[in-house]
Amino acid sequence: MQQEEIIEGYYGASKGLKKSGIYAKLDFLQSATGLVLALFMIAHMFLVSSILISDEAMYKVAKFFEGSLFLKAGEPAIVSVVAAGVILILVVHAFLALRKFPINYRQYKVFKTHKHLMKHGDTSLWFIQALTGFAMFFLASIHLFVMLTEPESIGPHGSSYRFVTQNFWLLYIFLLFAVELHGSIGLYRLVIKWGWFKNVSIQGLRKVKWAMSVFFIVLGLCTYGAYIKKGLENKDNGIKTMQEAIEADGKFHKE
């Protein structure tokens, strides 16, 4: 009992905080929002990589998000609503995750000492997740704001124009690695935390986690290259404004 009190005093914990159930509820909410964002990330990567199939395939995916199954021409505002929802979930998740970040130098030193002494792989993964999560909050917010305010620009020509001519390639290369590492580590830690797939060993889960990271990073880099290539073709074809790029995408609808 005395040892427990010493540890609690070292970390600044109190008996009142220990008895509160609010922290368990916040922890569950953090896990739930993280799971939603991770699943969205996976779906998003598969959908944007449709440009690897063809420009028309990517255009159809974009129109699908605009409700083309129900509205013949699609409605870009639907994309704005989805983007707003993702932004809300991202902010809530980030706010909840900040509870576990070292908030002062003393806590950082405690974590650093713990990380050095334990030399545990999962502790290092948490540190990577914390860094990528911090970067994602800013990088993803910029991307989501563009999707929120310019949903009509999503398409093979419009998106690639943003990549090359508007220089978003610099943002997206950092966002790619941050999202894929953060998401795969997050899913791995969720599986362990909540006891899913109990018949799979920790070593097996780690292999799945790294396989997932490699797969999505490679897929992301191939997709990244495809948008760069298309963006350079836009320049060669004389597309000088976003409006011209949007009009070029419109030809797929007419077809």
For each predicted feature, which ranges?
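Membrane-embedded alpha-helical bundles that constitute the cytochrome b-like, heme-associated redox core
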Residues: 1-255
